């Protein structure tokens, strides 16, 4: 799994978490993963996560 794929999955987890604590945990993970990517990569991951959720 690439860093971009990991970020996309973490964003999906943050958006679909069943409670605030888990959403915060996933959000923190996503933020940590995003540190190694540039702005355009992070924006693409956000778009990918939203697209995946729309298709679900």
Model-identified regions with their sequence ranges:
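N-terminal acidic leader/helix
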Residues: 1-24
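Short, charge-rich amphipathic interface segments used for partner binding and complex assembly
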Residues: 20-56
């Amino acid at each position: 799994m690439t860093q971009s794929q990991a970020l996309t999955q973490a964003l999906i987890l943050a958006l679909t978490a069943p409670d605030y604590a888990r959403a915060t945990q996933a959000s923190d993970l996503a933020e940590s993963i995003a540190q190694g990517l540039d702005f355009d990569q992070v924006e693409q991951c956000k778009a990918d996560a939203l697209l995946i959720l729309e298709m679900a």
